[in-house]
Amino acid sequence: MLRAITTTIIGVILGMMAMMAMHYLSMVFYPLPEAVTMEGAEALNKYMEIAPLVAMLLVIVSHAMGSFIGALVATLLSEREEWKNSTAFKYQCLFTGLLFTYTSWYNLENLIQPDWFKIDLLFYLPATYLGYKLVAKRA
């Protein structure tokens, strides 16, 4: 049980780090205007209204990638025998996906984004499941 909790926390942290790395990588191709920073919510809200479509799609990809990597890492760090015997592990990757989904929903509520961007919420759980399955099927 303790191992499942620890690996979940590590997976979530590394998944969030991967997601932020993807965000910053996408800013190489679509840089923020000079007056906008990631810390300033008001300026970021104004930018979200005029952001290019491809930049917004890269945000969705980075969110799904973070969820995918979080589950992948959590699964890799867990013992393989736990996959068969532990109830805690069955919900480990689900928790990772739900946490990413919740944080995205929170951002959707607090930042101004196009209505179509809510589709972002649909990608977390499938990405988490894919990250889990890629490792679990090797066991």
Task: Please give the residue ranges for each predicted region.
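Juxtamembrane/disordered regions of integral membrane proteins
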Residues: M1-A139
